[in-house]
């Protein structure tokens, strides 16, 4: 089960390794560095090494494990900060006595789970019950915010059977908590199991994404919504607000469990993001957000190959919590760094480059990643539903959205939130370009908004979006001829579009009144602007100039409402404001006539 190194090229090692299998986990060299077989030619294996290869030399041993790179799934996973191959960074720091990650620290020294931790196990089944792979056998209370459900793992070797033994009590993570008698023999189930990171976890049926994932960001929730089980991309150049967007989503998105994957970002940016995440409180309970979060960190100064593993690792952890019946959100920042890692490894093992040097299978890998999102009926004998939502940032060089990663990503996502440097430099945040963004989930989430907020939601949303498009067309005329060339109706459109931008789309992520924005507040802010538009049209027909309408007290207050009205008071105060606005405009018309 071992071989020898033949040559080393950066993160790639070629070894004479008879019997090696694709994507098999191996240990490379005397210091046993993590590696994964990415190409096999006869008895020769090309290995991408997940640690720094400095000091390796030809002739050193390569040891096969016989199994693929796998995630360890079970209690003690919540609240941990892992590297790309699921080694706990805090444990590594204690072992190495150094803030920098020492090489050769394997799962034997720093296991992903604390297998000796004890939990009070409460069974959900009893002896004699029939169970299938994927069924919940019991639960442990891991944190104040999360109950960790223990599953009968849906591994290929597991079959339906009858519970032979299960008992309540205090157990270590590595203890057997149930025995299940199947046709293939008795299966001893522990609190944890392993799952290959590149293999999607099974489910019974994929459901349409019909419920919106409320994020508290108005531009996202109202204009370009994402559904639970959907996939979204946030492309943008340096300084356009991608990291703040990811932070806002991680804090306010109404998902039960959050997995931020910091993939290939700069070390100081990742450290800053981590410090911010560690300080965040859950808005609903005031408890630390870390009690419903697991973080994966793989900065740009860490070995390039581990970036690929970190994305798959985060998705696998997300699927595991989805299988417990939770709504899970995976936030990957950024997939461009992951693609760059793929490009480097592919070129080093001699694969034919495609567009801009990326491997020809880049679209396939992106599809594999985004297709793991979904709202599904889970495995097991009882019908349960869980969802995995993926939102990933993309960092196109120079903000060029035609480069391969961004252009291929567009094919596999349902929501596209491009960040505009022009908006970011003018201090308009979130800097989502409303003319380039889109969402394929508007039709599917419309029923939820109509039922839970207002039947008028779709009509008003579409009207505001069309006004923004008209504004862009009118701006061309204004640049050439000035506002004097516009009719009163067109001037009114520009005034309303200004209100949409300043009073609705703009949002201060650090203002507790402005962010998060509850669905009812979002709708009523939108309705207030729409009322100004509709009543204004009638006033203009009656001869009132657009400039006079803009000088009304209520209209002047419109852009400030988002920062004055809290979510709790939104229904009462905004409804009253809309009535006052209508009254003022109609009084203006009456005085004119």
Curated annotation (Swiss-Prot):
GO MF entry, a single one: proton-transporting ATPase activity, rotational mechanism
Compartments reported by the entry: Cell membrane
Superkingdom classification of source: Archaea
Bilayer topology: Peripheral membrane protein
EC id: 7.1.2.2
Any Gene Ontology biological process: proton motive force-driven plasma membrane ATP synthesis
Residues that bind ATP: 236-243
Parts forming coiled coils: none
One cellular component term from this protein's GO annotations in UniProt: plasma membrane
Keyword Translocase carried by entry: yes
Record has Metal-binding as a keyword: no
Annotated keywords: ATP synthesis, ATP-binding, Cell membrane, Hydrogen ion transport, Ion transport, Membrane, Nucleotide-binding, Translocase, Transport
Class of this enzyme: translocase
Alphabetical list of CDD domains matching this protein: ATP-synt_V_A-type_alpha_C, ATP-synt_V_A-type_alpha_N, V_A-ATPase_A
Catalytic activity: ATP + H2O + 4 H(+)(in) = ADP + phosphate + 5 H(+)(out)
Residue stretches spanning the membrane: none
InterPro entries per record: ATP-synt_VA_C (IPR055190), ATP-synth_a_Xtn (IPR031686), ATP_synth_asu-like_sf (IPR023366), ATPase_F1/V1/A1_a/bsu_N (IPR004100), ATPase_F1/V1/A1_a/bsu_N_sf (IPR036121), ATPase_F1/V1/A1_a/bsu_nucl-bd (IPR000194), ATPase_F1/V1_b/a_C (IPR024034), P-loop_NTPase (IPR027417)
Quaternary data: Has multiple subunits with at least A(3), B(3), C, D, E, F, H, I and proteolipid K(x).
Described purpose of this protein according to its UniProt entry: Component of the A-type ATP synthase that produces ATP from ADP in the presence of a proton gradient across the membrane. The A chain is the catalytic subunit.
Family: Belongs to the ATPase alpha/beta chains family.
Protein name: A-type ATP synthase subunit A
Gene name of this polypeptide: atpA
